[in-house]
Amino acid sequence: MSIEIITGPMYSGKTTELIRRITRYKLCKKNCVIISHSIDNRCEEDDNILINHDGFKISHDDFIKTNILINKIKIFDKYEIIGIDECQFFDSNDLMIFCDTLANNGKKIIVAGLNSDFNKNPFKSIIKLIPISEKITKLQSICNFCYNDATFTMKKFNKDIIIEIGGSDLYIPVCRICYNENNTIN
């Protein structure tokens, strides 16, 4: 059917938008599932709960945490709508093949993830999905310094570690000007 991408910096509402879209389909009695990478510590798998950075929770009957997608493709046959949160953590080839295969088999895939790391380098998982996607939504946050629209994520410290799970203690959204002026925070 189709692939939709929701992307942007941290705190731009990607998970909130994913939850909103999935909730709309659930209200229409569509069979939905949400997938999150097993590295994501905002999820409460035992309670089937997905949590955004604001603490908003959605309880979902069908919630799966995994780090590999393609070898589990058969378990998604029963779903019409498949949401994938924190897509930047998944292997880019695995994610691309998974999404393309399911979309070609009549599933709607909604993928949410960061547009880039704190060095403004794009995540391969997003880049590889762009050519095979029907819809791309780029969200913005609010700059922590000047309160203008923010399109980048800046890391406060530990800048030698590219993938590090953290919240506002470690990452902040910033605009281009404030990124360039303040990206020396240690």
Swiss-Prot record:
It comes from the Viruses. PROSITE patterns: TK_CELLULAR_TYPE. Belongs to the thymidine kinase family. Its EC number is 2.7.1.21. It catalyses: thymidine + ATP = dTMP + ADP + H(+). InterPro entries: P-loop_NTPase, Thymidine_kinase, Thymidine_kinase_CS. The keyword Isomerase does not apply. GO terms for molecular function: ATP binding; metal ion binding; thymidine kinase activity. Substrate binds at F118, I162, I163, E164, I165, G166. Keywords: ATP-binding, DNA synthesis, Kinase, Metal-binding, Nucleotide-binding, Transferase, Zinc. It comes from Choristoneura biennis entomopoxvirus. Zn(2+) binds at C143, C146, C175, C178. ATP binds at G8, P9, M10, Y11, S12, G13, K14, T15. The active site is at E86. This is Thymidine kinase. The gene is TK. SUPFAM superfamilies: Glucocorticoid receptor-like (DNA-binding domain), P-loop containing nucleoside triphosphate hydrolases. GO terms for biological process: DNA biosynthetic process; thymidine metabolic process.
